[in-house]
A protein has these predicted regions:
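N-terminal localization/anchoring segments of enzymes in phospholipid and broader phosphate metabolism
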Residues: 2-365, 369, 373, 397
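Hydrophobic alpha-helix-in-membranes signature
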Residues: 90-93, 382, 403
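Active-site metal-binding loops of divalent metal-dependent hydrolases
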Residues: 280, 383-384
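Helical hairpin unit composed of two closely spaced alpha helices linked by a short loop
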Residues: 374-375, 384-404
């Protein structure tokens, strides 16, 4: 490592500490505001103590209704049980919290906005019945899962797409940088966490160069995921160099009915022809530039060909959903180009995304279906293993069948 690299790393470390401190301050301030709101609610309840018997009766009746609603819902048991216990043990607190954040469906205005964008975007996805039939004929089990994805998430299956798998995140980053430098029309990037440090600076330099060449660059990130990594002036800094930024569900100092919904997508789209996705965010620890949790193991994939269209639609859906209509795209067709790429590989590719506006757990259902249909082996690679009871049961059952 050269002296200059050491100085840059030291500078990134100091800046990282400052950003973490800034994020902690934001969290603390927001926590204090939420506590004050909670204290106000408790004070109001105390003031209404003279109506305690009536309030208590109504709360218990409502608690019973909510417990029955939860029991009949299609949520997983790991999602139901904490709410059921909280509501039964602490009815007033449990009912209040559930009505505030447990419904997890967003506001009516937000739902209408998502629905409107989906009505405009989803019809632009191809509907290749021949491709579906070919998959179903060649691999019936995969065909069934593919049909489920298309029916419940609206994303189709493709051919004519080449895939490269990266067993380390840093390899994916290197390939990503090389492809970003070749962008001619647009670059879309959507990530749960962005850290304004070494890894991002490598990307930012390429993005700034592409902006000067007339390329439209959009960056989208989750506020909670990035809260300890970037300062509040990050968007202003990016806009000053021509990089357009938007934030998903900003963390505000107050109770928020949509707070529990976070954007965990990791997507890069280049000219609608090349796409990257996988498990890594754009933060130093994912590429082992820093080691706060030891050696980090994550993966990524590169797509080139027709299947990139679904990644483009996924990005445009969320980008337009979080902003006012007058700032949104009036025409999506300019980003959904027809590719003349001829793939070397002959497999089937189906990128898909889940929606925060419904209760269908598409991602989990796909994994459970894959495990249930496995005959020889079922291998997963993830730095996180936080699974539901249903997923755990599926894995155990597969192991009992002799699946590795």
């Amino acid at each position: 490592m050269t002296e200059g690299e050491r100085k840059n790393m030291k500078q990134d470390t100091l800046e990282g500490r400052a950003k973490t401190k800034n994020g902690v301050k934001r969290l603390c301030f927001s926590a204090v505001c939420i506590l004050l709101e909670a204290a106000f609610i408790i004070a109001m309840i105390t003031k209404l103590n003279q109506y305690a018997e009536i309030i208590n009766l109504m709360t218990r009746l409502l608690a019973g209704v909510l417990v029955l609603k939860l029991y009949a819902s299609d949520q997983t048991s790991s999602m139901k049980m904490p709410w059921v216990i909280l509501i039964l043990v602490f009815p007033i607190l449990g009912v209040g919290l559930y009505l505030l954040i447990g419904l997890n469906g967003g506001t009516r205005k937000m739902r209408e906005r998502y629905d409107q964008i989906d009505r405009e975007l989803l019809p632009l996805l191809p509907n290749d019945s021949e491709c579906r039939e070919t998959l179903g004929r060649k691999i019936p089990k995969a065909g069934n899962i593919s049909d489920y994805i298309q029916k419940n998430a609206s994303y189709p299956v493709y051919q004519n797409t080449d895939v490269i798998y990266y067993d380390e995140a840093v390899k994916g980053l290197e390939a990503q940088l090389a492809d970003l430098a070749k962008a001619e029309k647009f670059i879309f990037m959507e990530y749960h966490a962005i850290e304004d440090a070494q890894a991002w600076h490598k990307i930012q330099r390429v993005l700034e160069d592409r902006v000067k060449a007339g390329v439209e660059v959009r960056v989208f990130y989750d506020d909670m995921g990035s809260i300890g990594f970037i300062n509040t002036d990050f968007i202003k800094k990016m806009e000053n160099v021509g990089i357009h930024c938007r934030v998903f569900n900003p963390f505000t100092p107050g109770l928020n009915v949509f707070l529990n919904n976070r954007d965990h997508r990791k997507i890069t789209v280049i000219d609608g022809k090349v796409g990257f996705t996988g498990g890594y965010n754009l933060a130093n620890e994912y590429f082992n530039f820093t080691h706060p949790y030891g050696q980090w193991k994550d993966t990524g994939i590169r797509l080139e060909g027709e299947a990139v269209r679904s990644l483009t639609v996924t990005f445009l859906e969320m980008w337009n959903a979080v902003s006012d209509k007058d700032k949104n795209d009036s025409d999506f067709t300019g980003f959904l180009v027809q590719t003349d790429y001829q793939a070397k590989q002959t497999g089937f590719i189906q990128p898909y995304a889940d929606s925060p506006m419904d209760h269908e757990q598409v991602g989990e259902e796909v994994y459970i279906s894959m495990v249930n249909k496995a005959e020889k082996y079922c291998w997963f690679m993830t730095p996180y293993l936080i699974i539901t009871d249903e997923m755990s049961h599926a894995l155990c059952l597969a192991a009992k069948r002799g699946v590795d």
